[in-house]
Amino acid sequence: MNYKIIAIDGPASSGKSSVSRELSKILGYIYFNTGLVYRAIGFLKSKNIDFFDAVEKNRLVFELLIGQTKVIFDHDDITKELTKEYVGALASEVAKEPSLREKIIVFQRSLVKDNAVVEGRDVGTHIFKDATIKFFIDADPKERALRRYLEEGGSYEDILNKILKRDETDKNRKDYPFRKAEDAIQIDTTCMTKEEVINLCMEYIKKVL
């Protein structure tokens, strides 16, 4: 691999997405949110469209840019649509299929052809095991729930319960259980600002670039 990969993993609402986008801008690296692949599969499945067929026919295109990942379907930007809760539920079902998951990992790797900040579950353990540097961004579940509540509103208790349930489900998956890569640098963001997390990540990154 002739390019640098900054792999950032971690549970939901740990702050990994905002940190990853900012690091991408600082470094001038493309940004790849790998979870959007699962969401795109779920989105197309709801329309009875095969994901890999859509990719092959160029109906579905992933644009990896500095600070953002765009998903284009039939010339329309569907990136925002993919962030909706119903799509997330569909994506979770897709992630439970081990035979499909392996094919997805191969596809995700094929999209990265330049220096990149790659963010998402299993990035350090399965997708890019040989990444230049790996981070595992974590935070206390209550803090993660509070962040999502402040961002999206709704019921704090419901959000916390969903996060705890998601954590439990991911850790106990029979195939590809969610875990920290052994060589990943763990950062607990519970009592840290986004700027503090970014600065700490950059300190580590500068040592390996």
From Swiss-Prot:
Organism the protein comes from: Hydrogenobaculum sp. (strain Y04AAS1)
Family statement drawn from the similarity comment of this UniProt entry: Belongs to the cytidylate kinase family. Type 1 subfamily.
Task: Enumerate the catalysed reactions.
Answer: CMP + ATP = CDP + ADP; dCMP + ATP = dCDP + ADP
State the HAMAP family in the record.
Cytidyl_kinase_type1 (MF_00238)
Whether Kinase counts among this entry's keywords is: yes
The name on file for this protein is Cytidylate kinase
Give residues annotated as binding ATP: 10-18
Q: What is its EC number?
A: 2.7.4.25
Q: Where in the cell is it found?
A: Cytoplasm
* InterPro entries found in the cross-reference section: Cytidylate_kin (IPR003136), Cytidylate_kinase_dom (IPR011994), P-loop_NTPase (IPR027417)
Keywords from the named record: ATP-binding, Cytoplasm, Kinase, Nucleotide-binding, Transferase
